Design a protein with these regions (language model features):
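Flexible loop/hinge segments at secondary-structure junctions
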Residues: 19-306
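Bacterial N-terminal signal peptides
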Residues: 3-14
Length: 306
């Protein structure tokens, strides 16, 4: 009996160590509308696994993430674009080191028209002429009717073009401005929406329209246009072309966090990011309509968290 007692006593530290750590507290994020649905899925999963954790998600646009992360009002800044230099500098001025960008999914900026529109592809210079007042990409003519884009069918040739897009708080807006407008200025008659879903729904209900949105919001009623590359190839946005980089407007989606060099993340934040980068977390990416990270990308993201 004494021997059994001693054996159990000797195993006690190991048994205590094996007990799972019970997480509790609040975890909050602000930023991208594109990532809003995914963040909600991940947050719900995390709260189910750790009932003592409350995850709050604000999705007002990528431009809100750097300010909130720098102020310390959130632990996660969700962004559909990289932080700009001035946003990083503001964070560094306060903390003395840059924020950590953790890629969590692959997305792409896509151009959408109504599913009944016969247009087969679009050239970036045409998009610049369509959406920009400055036309820095070099286009001369400003298309105002679908005949200007090569549609000569009687019901399309004289049909006016309606432009739909995102508002300036959006990372998708900033990415489109950079990639399609050569950093030019938008026309003031582009109808702006706070989310990609609203853009796609508007295009689905309007034969005249063309818009841009996130790949994750490819809903019924619209057609995703192939984009002409510099070598004259029309590349459609699909999982293969986005992963390979053939599609010109592929982009990672990021979660930015405050991680001091050489120091671990707080346990609650670290556990959440580990879940996001797990097989189950990446399955949620697929369910939401985006592309999971590759094994190489996953390994790099996990290493950055150490």
């Amino acid at each position: 009996m004494r021997a059994l007692f001693l054996l159990l006593f000797s195993l006690l530290p190991a048994l205590v160590q094996a007990q799972p750590v019970m997480l509790s507290g609040n975890l909050s994020s602000a930023g991208s509308d594109t990532l809003g649905y995914l963040m909600t899925l991940w947050g719900d999963d995390f709260s189910r696994q750790s009932p003592g954790v409350n995850v709050q998600v604000q999705a007002s646009g990528s431009s809100t993430a750097p300010t909130a992360l720098t102020a310390g009002s959130v632990q996660i800044g969700a962004m559909s674009r990289p932080m700009q230099a001035d946003e990083r500098q503001a964070f560094e001025a306060r903390y003395g080191y840059p924020p950590l960008a953790v890629p969590v999914a692959m997305d792409a900026l896509v151009v959408v028209v109504n599913q009944r529109n016969p247009l087969q592809s679009v050239d970036p210079r045409q998009l610049d002429a369509l959406f920009s007042v400055t036309r820095l990409c070099g286009a001369q003519q400003v298309p105002e009717r679908w005949g200007d884009l090569g549609l000569h069918q009687p019901e399309w040739q004289q049909r006016a073009i309606q432009r739909y897009g995102r508002n300036s708080a959006s990372g998708t807006w900033g990415f489109f401005k950079q990639q399609a407008l050569c950093q030019g200025d938008f026309r003031n008659d582009v109808a702006e929406f706070p989310g990609s879903a609203a853009v796609v729904q508007a295009v689905a209900g309007d034969l005249r329209s063309i818009g841009y949105a996130s790949f994750g919001f490819h809903l019924s009623g619209v057609k995703l246009l192939p984009v002409m590359t510099k070598n004259g190839e029309a590349v459609a946005p699909d999982p293969d072309s986005i992963r390979s980089g053939r599609y010109p407007w592929a982009r990672p989606l990021y979660l930015y966090v405050n991680k001091a060099p050489g120091k671990p993340l707080p346990p609650l934040l670290a556990a959440f990011l580990q879940q996001v980068l797990s097989e189950a977390g990446q399955q949620r990416v697929s369910e939401a309509g985006y592309l999971p990270l590759s094994e190489t990308q996953m390994a790099g993201a996990r290493k950055a968290l150490q």
